[in-house]
């Protein structure tokens, strides 16, 4: 295996946690979580496909690579939606997943840091992303849904409340507790070695 291909394989794994958060948000947005769907399964399928297609990737930067991975994930999510709903290929559905994934990804990136250019800063950014994904996974389910829908998917408190079949006050409480727990978890993880 060529060194550049090994590097691309490693880069693929760096994005696994972020892709799982994004997939979970999109599966919930599309109403697919009630099916026997798992974000980790969809991401695993997307990464297997990405590894098989590594020679086809022509970009040079991490943002290009991350965008390429999100495009593959969007296609996998559209496949899942077709499997559990409409059976025909739907370009609008794939485009919708891609746009929503891109918006959620921007919100996720905004949470972890500003622009960073040095190699060490780049590694720190990936580490922060992994820690944020882990901290989100550690939240109680309803707090995680509220935080992801409001802060990453961009829904208002009222929209999040409607999606969760809760009152706005209840969702505000979930957000408050979720963010407090998330902050505590992240501070604890910052003190832990790698």
Report residues per predicted region.
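Short alpha-helix-to-loop micro-motif enriched in aromatics/charged/Gly
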Residues: 31, 54-63, 88
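Short, charged helix-capping/linker segments at alpha-helix termini
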Residues: 2-14, 21-45, 60, 168-169, ...
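Arg/Lys-rich amphipathic alpha helix in sigma70-family domain 2
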Residues: 25, 56, 74-103, 125, ...
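Short helix-coil-helix linker/hinge
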Residues: 126, 136-144
């Amino acid at each position: 295996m060529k060194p550049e291909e090994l590097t691309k394989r490693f880069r693929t794994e760096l994005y696994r946690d972020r892709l799982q958060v994004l997939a979970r948000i999109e599966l919930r947005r599309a109403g697919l979580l009630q099916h026997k769907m798992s974000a980790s399964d969809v991401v695993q399928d997307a990464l297997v496909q990405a590894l098989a297609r590594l020679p086809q990737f022509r970009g040079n930067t991490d943002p290009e690579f991350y965008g390429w991975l999100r495009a593959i994930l969007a296609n996998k999510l559209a496949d899942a939606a077709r499997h559990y709903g409409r059976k025909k290929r739907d370009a609008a559905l794939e485009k919708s997943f891609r746009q929503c994934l891109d918006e959620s990804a921007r919100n996720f990136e905004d949470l972890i840091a500003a622009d960073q250019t040095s190699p060490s800063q780049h590694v720190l950014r990936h580490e922060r992303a992994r820690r944020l994904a882990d901290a989100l996974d550690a939240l109680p389910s309803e707090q995680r849904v509220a935080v992801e829908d409001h802060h990453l998917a961009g829904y208002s408190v009222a929209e999040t409340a409607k999606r969760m079949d809760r009152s706005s006050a209840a969702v505000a409480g979930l957000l408050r507790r979720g963010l407090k727990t998330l902050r505590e978890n992240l501070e604890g993880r910052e003190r832990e070695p790698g």
